[in-house]
């Protein structure tokens, strides 16, 4: 990718986030009580748009990353599951879970009050794919064109955590995002 001034680089980082949030606000405006179905519409819309941006970036940014073998992917999934359990246990032991218990209850109510297949589709597939495309597929890769691995990863993690809204989700997103970006 050719040299770009700092202002252009920042715009290239900000506009995918703005699009992501605008889609969320538009869907919320159209379906204020839409629950997980509205969330599914939002995430699928994000996957399509972020997929287009990712595809365009793939043509411009030469990615030097290693290919992930099936064995490594399975190991990473197992480590991710263990990390989820570990983070939950850590939050329980330290009392962090009670910091914003009302927020946690509201999130749980919104996520787990619909049909199981819809929960799996939204929470287990659509949301992670949309977030991975945006935060690691677009933002992290764009930052890697002008920053080293460490600062790029840290910046992407901080943005990923901040977008999750409340302290508990931000901490959780930061810790698990660090596993994914590693």
Predicted regions and their residues:
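Transmembrane helix-loop-helix hairpins at the membrane interface
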Residues: 116-182
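Hydrophobic faces of alpha-helical transmembrane segments in multi-pass integral membrane proteins
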Residues: 15, 19, 23, 41, ...
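Transmembrane helix-loop junctions in multipass membrane proteins, especially transporters and channels
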Residues: 28, 32-33, 55-62, 92-100, ...
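N-terminal membrane topogenic signal
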Residues: 1-17
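Alpha-helical transmembrane segments in multi-pass membrane proteins
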Residues: 12-57
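Membrane-interface starts of transmembrane alpha-helices
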Residues: 30-45, 114-119, 148-156
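Juxtamembrane helix-loop-helix connectors linking adjacent transmembrane helices
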Residues: 62-130, 145
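Structural signal for membrane-spanning alpha-helices in multi-pass inner-membrane proteins
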Residues: 24-28, 50-57, 88, 123, ...
């Amino acid at each position: 990718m050719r040299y770009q001034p700092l202002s252009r680089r920042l715009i290239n980082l900000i506009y995918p986030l703005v699009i992501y949030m605008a889609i969320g606000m538009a869907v919320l405006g159209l379906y204020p009580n839409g629950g997980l179905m509205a969330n599914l519409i939002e995430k699928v819309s994000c996957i399509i748009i972020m997929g287009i941006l990712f595809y365009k970036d793939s043509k411009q940014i030469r990615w030097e990353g290693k290919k992930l073998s099936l064995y490594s992917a399975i190991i990473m999934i197992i480590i991710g599951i263990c990390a989820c359990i570990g983070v939950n246990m850590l939050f329980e032991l330290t009392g962090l879970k009670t910091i914003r218990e009302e927020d946690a209850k509201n999130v749980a109510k919104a996520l787990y009050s619909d049909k199981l297949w819809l929960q799996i589709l939204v929470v287990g597939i659509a949301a992670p794919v949309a977030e991975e495309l945006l935060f690691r597929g677009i933002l992290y890769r764009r930052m890697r064109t002008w920053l080293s691995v460490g600062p790029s990863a840290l910046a992407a993690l901080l943005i990923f955590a901040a977008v999750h809204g409340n302290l508990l989700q931000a901490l959780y997103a930061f810790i698990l995002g660090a596993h994914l970006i590693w």
